[in-house]
Amino acid sequence: MIRASLKSLLARRVRLLLSTFAIVLGVAFVTGILMFSDTVQRSFVALFDSTVGDSVVRPVNSDVAQQGAVFSTQTVPASLQPDLERLPGAARVDGMVSATGVYVLSTGGKVVGGSGPPAFGGNWNDAPAGHGLEGLVILDGHEPHGADEVVLDESTADRAGYELGDKVSIVTATQTLDVHPTLVGIAGFREGGSLNGATYAAFDTPTAQQLFLDGKDAYTVFWVTARDGVSQEELTEQVAAALPEGYEAVTGDDAAEESAGPLLSGIGFLTTFLLIFAGIALVVSSYIIVNTFSILVAQRSRELALLRALGASKKQVIRSVQLEAFAVGLVGSTLGLGLGVVLAMGIRALVSSIGLDLAHQPLILAPRTVLAAFATGIVVTMVAAWLPARRTGRIAPVQALRDDVALPESSVRRRLLLGVALLAAGIPLALVGLFVGAVPHNGWWVGAGVLAVLLGVTAASPVIGRPFLRATGAVEARAFGPMGRLAGQNSLRNPRRTTATASALMIGLTLAFTVAILGSSAKASVDKAVEDNFIGDYVVSSAFGEGFSPAITDRMAEIDGVTEVLRQRYGFGLLGGDEDDGLSIVATAPETIGDFHLKAVAGSVSDFADDTVLLKEDWADDHDLGVGDTLEVTLPTGAKKWRVVGVVEDSPLVFSPVLTTTQTLLDSGFPDQDNYVVVFADPGATGLQERLDAVVEDLPVVTVKDQQAFAAEQRAPIDRIIGIIYGLLFFAVVIAVLGIVNTLALSVIERTREIGLLRAIGVSRRQLRQMIRLESVVIAVLGAVLGVALGIVFGVTLMYALRDQGLERISIPVVQLVVFLVLSLVLGVLAAVFPARRAARLDVLRAIAAD
């Protein structure tokens, strides 16, 4: 049986080519994603390990601000350094000055990076990293000396177009440097690697202290390097014992883990997100495999019947088909692994082009990736091939020797019953999630219901699709005559095969149109929210979320035509000191609280003052807080207790559940910077946009936007996310189109004698090609119609489920619906090119004689 299976496999290797290619694409997707994820994780772990000392001295609670991606003004005084240097376990102590939001402008005046990875500034230091690792070193040039010299990391200098000796333009959200320092050094890691897209500008220590610490003789942190034989834990114990109250020491490993933790969690989420789409691609691939082996098994029914008649058992026949599937999966997995490496290189290049510079990072091919590639490809192939293999074993040998072997009707009935059962379970699940408020995790109920409905429609598609196939066949017969009639009859000849092929396309288009509705509705909801809640006439903010100098707001307030400015500032704390319960905070001046138009449901907005807070109603209810209670929160300066003076209705004008005063936030260790400013204009003011822009013309990271520009800025991330998802779904659609090509190509082989007879009675090559194209169009249109219908239902359902998240307006993009349907027709025609050409080129006599 093994020899027979291998001979059968070699004899039909061309027929298995497209199925193998489908597995190749699915496995490549999985491999590429896992390789990229491992590469990113390894690079960031190595980066953070190289940017901490053996022991790190910092202000207590300084990590609170870091968790919220905000800047703290807390520092460690330089006077601590001599005491630390006298410790028996300390080899050296280095003071580090570090600040975020320090942007390098390119030679063309554009900000380098900043759209994702941070932009750092600080003092140059050649201290070794923890465990003796080498940190940044000067690769070319020399260290900076004086206020007119700067060192840039290698990637930043390259992206900005600077060479040694050039004058460098550097800005922050608060100021443009008065001097244009000369680039005197290029820094990097001697053993390769990079800052992964972050930018770094280093000055000498006095200059960095003047620029980033207001001239204080202090540092952001100290790095303490351990002597030989002293562990990080031993050194940190010595350091902690020597520190006064208000400062703490942590091991370099712990500091690196704190910095890398949130980022690695995000990478883990991204990996899971991408693997979901890889799973979709593999599911679509499985449809192709089921169809391929169903057709091949049907073509080999006589051969397998003879084997049964010669003594082969039912299990042996099934195992022979499974052996062929194993071989297909093995070849597909091997090729997919190789293509996955290429795909990972492409992902790395794409990500590097948008800011996360990984071009210098070697790709990581971990053993688990290789195992996942082969396990995924082989298991998916063998599971998909098991159904037709099992079906073969159910047909009696004598029956299989006949020419008219047919699938038992009981199989179709079972699929219908399964489909009805899934629909009967899925619809109530979705309804419970949508309308029963007491049920926890409503979104999971809706998601489970949607998935069950999708699987139910797929299972019942042979029955659901029959009326559509008949109707389409009638239309084609009327429009294209005999060839249209034949195409319709061929589609109905094996409705399960036709609908299975269409289901692969249906899944891709269902997801694509669901995403289209979610994206269109999200943008419509954003527009509505901006339209309903945009107060004032202009908003001022940093393009990268950094704070900016209040002097900018002061200058704008003095412009003729500006009647008022409303400032907001952002902070971050830990609720009750719990590291897992972060809390974002918004602050404004008490005298401007009326401009927020907040509606109190308890207490009074007029009681808003320093060391008090207003809470949003839903958040207050969730945390059992009310007027008169105390909100305990840990901030960079320590634990604080704020009195709750009001509970207000939800308002999109306040970007946090907690609102306090500007002075309260300033006293909590956050910088004196505005984050978001609303400008109110005199109704008769003209040319105000230009005058506001003039205030920030030297600060390209701070922008002034009217309502229309602000709405466009809010929509931009949605467009980017939708574009990424479409790109990921493209793989599934490509595989589905390959499925149509595969089914038609195998169908042509299966119907070789029939095609020969058609040619013998006068059907021309052109008519034959037309017939195959029409069959392909039927499959594509069926998949598109089901996909669009389900996409609309799922999209509207999910939007309704997300109504409490601010997505209040449902928008169905009709133009995209039409485009999807037209593209389906085009894909159907293109998918038929190869099979139709093959059918038209068959030799008539050989085709008639074919068995």
For the regions a protein language model found, what residue spans apply to each?
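Hydrophobic alpha-helical membrane-associated segments
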Residues: L25-F36, A281-S285, I289, V331, ...
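Alpha-helical transmembrane segments, especially those used as permease/efflux helices
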Residues: A11, R15-L17, F269-T272, R368, ...
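Membrane transport/envelope proteins' first extracytoplasmic loop
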Residues: I2-L6, A11-S286, I295, V530-D532, ...
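C-terminal transmembrane helical bundles of large multi-pass transporters
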Residues: T498, A502, R567, D674-F680, ...
